[in-house]
């Protein structure tokens, strides 16, 4: 079957003219040739490493640039988007006028016109009924490689029928000189137009802007159809039982969802519709800082030919120093999901989730290692999206720093957070799913809860043992905590027992409870949010 390809006339419809050549859906072998051409300069050039993977640099942008994110405010988005300039909550959805959008689009199309372009057609979403058909247009070979890794790769038959319903034009080489007069944050921009169904990128080379841009769009489109859109990992057991894991960076989401007894559905972005849980992506985007074969063998072995390393330090002999964070701590690798052996095949989807796990790394030492949540507590803790880090100082004094990120992914939410919470709980109630809050952080001993105990807790959740356990109610937070679980040290289940002086727990718990309440205040501007206050801690 012949693949349809794309004509210069189609690109002209987007405003891109006089293209010298279109490289359509290039193979991995062709991309390898293209990104290692000796004539390439600067951030376009890829370096072959001894792993077989290509390494690239993304310049000053080694992460997303949330302050440069904009959405066109028009008739479609006016009353639906969670705007940065409305309500109590702070977010990155800054409004953009149609006039400035047209100016930015002109900059990007001018940058791409007259060039040799890579066009990659992909799917975002493993479920054919709700997926986005996304067309990426770029002049940089490795950016085409990145989206081929990260999104779902259509078959030749699917490409023959491909009709894009979202266009991403990456003009990383262009910037906006008029940003000051236009009242924008900087010369760089990541802008979205939901009426035109288009994303524009200018000034930043970071690959993750394309990945997370489409996640933000799925986060807009799906919940409005009653489909949950989630920043989580997901896996499935031998009996078809599905678990989803929410958690911010450093809480153990990737580690705990990688389980030899269960198959991985995906590691980062999922939807939940009438058929079940499905991955948005066709690849993984893993952190590589301090990566070792012993600690994370799956990721380590996935770094081979066709993988793409970002911002790692490559030595003169082509070896990668994963311990060197001199460019950024956010070193990454993207690879197609089939580089991991233990995955759901051929399509990254499964049935309905019965276990929903919220991971938190509580550095305050207050929360229990595990608790069962009621429906209202599920919404409350989902909206809170709490974790905390220990910030060290010279004298070894460690003050915990709390982080609250709505729905465990505030940066990517396009609608008000309560809409995601409502859709998630509806999906859970329809199938009788249960949520659990799992603390992978610290307790009164000053030590982190052991990975052995945490894995035993996850096992008890997945095999149902936790639902048979007797529970007690932890005061202030009103959480149902099991009194004993197989394979878990019984001395840690009640966090108060880990303190030599229980009054210390009380003091810390009251402090943390106040922080929860202060954070949650921003949701009380909607009736749905105000109704959940009683599910939070009592001060």
Curated annotation (Swiss-Prot):
Location(s) in or outside the cell: Cytoplasm
EC identifiers of the protein: 4.1.1.49
Main localization (coarse): cytoplasm
Positions contributing to ATP binding: 212, 231, 247-255, 296, 332, 448-449, 454
CDD domains, A to Z: PEPCK_ATP (cd00484)
GO BP annotations listed: gluconeogenesis
Positions with a binding annotation for substrate: 64, 206, 212, 332
Pathway the protein contributes to: Carbohydrate biosynthesis; gluconeogenesis
Domain of life: Bacteria
Assigned keywords, A-Z: ATP-binding, Cytoplasm, Decarboxylase, Gluconeogenesis, Lyase, Manganese, Metal-binding, Nucleotide-binding
Catalytic activity of the protein: oxaloacetate + ATP = phosphoenolpyruvate + ADP + CO2
GO cellular component term of the entry, any: cytosol
GO molecular function: ATP binding; metal ion binding; phosphoenolpyruvate carboxykinase (ATP) activity
InterPro entries in UniProt: PEP_carboxykinase_ATP, PEP_carboxykinase_C, PEP_carboxykinase_N, PEPCK_ATP_CS
SUPFAM superfamilies in the record: PEP carboxykinase N-terminal domain, PEP carboxykinase-like
Binding site residues for Mn(2+): 212, 231, 268
Cofactor requirements of the protein: Mn(2+)
Role of this protein: Involved in the gluconeogenesis. Catalyzes the conversion of oxaloacetate (OAA) to phosphoenolpyruvate (PEP) through direct phosphoryl transfer between the nucleoside triphosphate and OAA.
Oligomer and partners: Monomer.
Protein's name according to its UniProt entry: Phosphoenolpyruvate carboxykinase (ATP)
Gene source species: Yersinia pseudotuberculosis serotype O:3 (strain YPIII)
